[in-house]
Regions:
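Oxyanion/phosphate-interacting regions
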Residues: 7-26, 191-200, 207, 213-275
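Residue-level signal for inorganic ion chemistry
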Residues: 32, 58, 69, 104, ...
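Short, Asp-centered acidic motifs that coordinate Mg2+ and/or phosphate
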Residues: 75, 128, 224-225
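Glycine-rich active-site/cofactor-binding loop and its immediate structural neighborhood
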Residues: 94-131
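Acidic beta-strand-loop-alpha-helix segment within the catalytic core
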Residues: 119-215, 264-275
């Protein structure tokens, strides 16, 4: 799909790069699904230093994305790639931040709630993001100042269907105040934050979701706030942050109320709130 077919006036500057990372995300998603749909295949599950799981699907997806971005003028920071020292990274004006398989635990649980995340970050700010949900054949993308969109993907051809602008108009009609939280990492601090919200929103409804789907729910307008008082890394949020920003939302440090920044010396995110 040529992204400019949606509205060429919106993508004059970044159109080729946006199309490149969308196609990379779709191909990476296909590589993941080729493994996911064959449970008899050896998924080669390993444990990383932080005890989080790593699978064959993570590695295959990373290889697809790294190859797609090889000719890009920007360096790549991927969860599954080499993490260069900050003394080198601090000179990067722009870079790609990638999670080839966000939600590996969800992948292993076979609950379909895993994603491919690709973001372009400039001067610490995510300016473009793509999230593909391969098991649901749903694509999200956004660019700073140009809007955010979602579309279905044909499972056979990977053709992208009609784009819908985010937030979805119908998503905010006649529904309770909705909080989305992690399916696998709901911390006591996050629960305290949610309980405080209940005092002001008696109709509060809690929705659990895996991976960067939580940020997508905010961008769609299907949820109002996403608190995360638990460890995350920059590649977990960069793409969703870009999409949420493009849809008119904020991703803020829970303590300082300032926007999250990227390509920091410490790649861990602080606790944050998306609203």
């Amino acid at each position: 799909m040529d992204i400019c077919s949606i509205d060429c006036s919106l993508y004059v500057i970044f159109a080729p790069m946006l199309d490149t990372i969308i196609q990379a995300a779709l191909r990476a998603g296909k590589a993941i699904m080729d493994i996911y749909t064959h449970p008899d295949l050896d998924w080669q599950v390993e444990r990383k230093a932080d005890n989080s799981p790593l699978t064959l699907a993570d590695r295959k997806s990373h290889a697809v994305i790294a190859e797609a971005l090889e000719s890009s003028p920007y360096p790549l920071l991927s969860e599954e790639g080499a993490h260069l020292p900050y003394d080198e990274r601090k000179h990067w004006h722009s870079l790609w931040i990638v999670d080839p398989l966000d939600g590996t635990k969800e992948f292993l649980k076979k609950n379909d709630e895993f994603t491919v995340n690709i973001a372009l970050v400039t001067d610490g700010v995510p300016v473009m993001g793509v999230i593909y949900v391969p098991a649901k054949y749903r694509l999200f993308w956004g660019e700073k100042g140009q809007g955010a969109f979602t579309a279905e993907v044909d499972p056979e051809t990977l053709h992208i269907g009609q784009a819908e602008s985010l937030p979805l108009k119908e998503a905010q009609l006649n529904r309770p105040y909705r909080v989305v939280a992690s399916r696998s990492h709901l911390s006591p601090e996050t629960e305290t934050f949610i309980n405080d919200l209940r005092r002001h929103h008696t109709d509060l409804e809690l929705v659990s979701a895996g991976s960067s789907l939580k940020l997508c729910l905010i961008a769609e307008g299907k949820a109002d706030v996403y608190p995360r008082m638990a460890p995350t890394m920059e590649w977990d949020t960069a793409a969703g942050h870009a999409i949420a920003l493009a849809a008119g939302h904020e991703v803020l440090n829970a303590e300082t109320d300032l926007p999250l920044t990227y390509n920091k010396e410490d790649l861990h995110n602080p606790w944050f709130v998306v609203k």
